[in-house]
Amino acid sequence: MVDKPKIGLGSEEIVNPSPALSKGTDCGSPPHVVYLTETFYISSKKNTVFEVRLTDKGLSLKKQSNGSTKEQTIPLKDIIGCRCLRSKRKAKGSSACACTSISGTAQLKVVEENSGEQDESDVSAYLYIYAYIMKRNRRGGFRERTTITLRFRSFDKYEDNNKEAQKWRAAIKYLVAGETSIRPTYQPKETRKLLVIINPKSGSGKAREMFQQRVAPVLAEAEISYDLHITKKSDWAREFVRNRDIYLWRGIVVVGGDGIFYEALNGLFEREDWQTAIDELTIGIIPCGSGNGLAKTIAHLYDEPFETKPILASALTIVKGKHSLLDIVRVETRSKIMFSFLSVGWGLISDIDIESERLRAIGGQRFTLWSVHRLISLRTYQGKVSYVPALVSNMNRSNSLPHEGGVGGGVGLLKHSISYNTTLDCHDCRTGGGGGAGANDSHSNCDACDTNFSDVLSLETGSNLDTFRPRIDSWYSATSRKSTYFSTVDSIYESDRASNEGTPNGANVAQMYGPPSRLPALTAPVSDGWKTIDGEFVMVHAAYQTHLSTDCFFAPLSKLNDGIIWLLIIKAGVSRSQLLSFLLGLSNGSHIPTQANRYIQMIPVTAFRIEPSGSSGHMTVDGENVEYGPIQAEIFPSLAKVMVPK
């Protein structure tokens, strides 16, 4: 029998943690708070013992082997969830004896406790802990998926072992949620599901497959339930959010490009109860479009790796359950009012954005190809641009904000997980993701079969059984991720219930609500305090996020809620070489001249108006084409809420 946890949980007991100094803790630093501790073993290594401690910092693993000791820690911020499972009953004709030797290639199969397929001869309870650990490299970093398996088998009855496992599960779930009052059974504060809306046409048309293969497994690990809807037509998401009882859900997650986020956002502002809706509901985004500016901005501001696995980065953001306030810009044309979160454009970038739609099938590369085309046949536009400069106090607040989400150091962070030499046989890759649009994707495009996703550390409490060779092979695993698309944690797939025609809940006339404008009428002259530039322009583009797309670092000083619009003006007369340098610099934020330039300038403003003289051209709001003509916009700081990693 192994040592029992130093801190126990009674049936109605709240853990009263005791402070304890972990190895490597500086005497001047506050001690770690230890909630649970237990001794585990690796059955294949007779002399290896792990003391596992759950602290306020994370899951501490102290390895003792042949007289040497090594301590590693998985930070709480990297853990997304855990589940208690038990072994699956063996197929008829196979050995049912729990102490039968398992070959090196055998894989343990686990099921839910009440699935009806459990192996009654195995009294062990298995706790699977899922973490995505930050790894740094010269290119920035990535998150490595690590699964820790704790096998509880100290007692003769499954119920007793499961009670111990559930105690650990509850404590981990509470701490990951940021709560320190821990009870033996986990009861989440929020029981409502997420509303997930997928635009299957976004980007290269693979959003549905990407959600199935890369997002649903992460939601399953975090035990996040959701209702899933597939859009049927343009503005479907907008109509759905406007008409439905959205308070049935605790948040909205859109899967697609920036366009579907724009739809959902404006659907909220078309509700009579818009103020309550934006106060209570947070919106998140999984980037499957061509641009993905907001998702990239969030990852950039919170120092999260994005380029290698953007969908994973955003899925982890969703499961963290955190949010930030988000500036929203009210935009007005001659016939329409809308609310924007990303940008307003006139000229070169808008031309590229709209005219490259014919190349949508090639994904984000369409922007590069059309940029070259537009640079060769450059257009200019006559008109007038007016703006309200941002106050100095706003500028100081913006530039003095610390860079959010810097990853702090720590003693003994888990550098490498201990893994059995087993490989994932990814069903999604073998079958081409179900024969859909992603059928020809290579293994390099599938998160499931990435080698960084196969790390497993398996530990067990003591007994006379040394036969455990763990390998998860259930609907939680990569080999059966197709089922998670429909069944993850009581989630519901709803798309076939919606009508193929009309609005999701019957037609009604849309009216835009939201905060009223504080600007002069669009037909009236601008007020005192506005500055005006009259002339010929190559482009005018206003942005309030750092990135307009994954590789367009447009406004490096921007924050999610700084109350500033960054207005870029490029006047006619700029040389093609200067424009080429500008376009090339957009990828790393070096596009703005470091010295005064008469043709290119970036101005921080709180409102602006564009008045074209001609009648032909493109104007865009959040990448969507809008009526060409006079347009004005003003920022409303911190009006909405968006999901963020921390």
Region locations from a protein language model:
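ATP/NTP phosphate-donor binding region
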Residues: 2-255, 262, 266, 273
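Generic C-terminus detector
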Residues: 157, 162, 166, 170, ...
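Core residues of folded domains in eukaryotic genome-function proteins
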Residues: 48-50, 55-57, 70-78, 123-127, ...
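Non-catalytic interaction/regulatory modules that flank or connect domains
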Residues: 128-132, 531-539, 545-558, 566, ...
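Catalytic core of DAGKc-family lipid kinases
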Residues: 207-209, 231-233, 239, 246-247, ...
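Catalytic phosphate-donor-binding core of small-molecule kinases
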Residues: 321, 371-382, 516, 547-549, ...
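Eukaryotic beta-rich interaction modules
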Residues: 30-46, 53-65, 73-77, 175-181, ...
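Conserved beta-strand elements of beta-rich interaction domains across eukaryotes
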Residues: 57-60, 66-67, 81, 134-136, ...
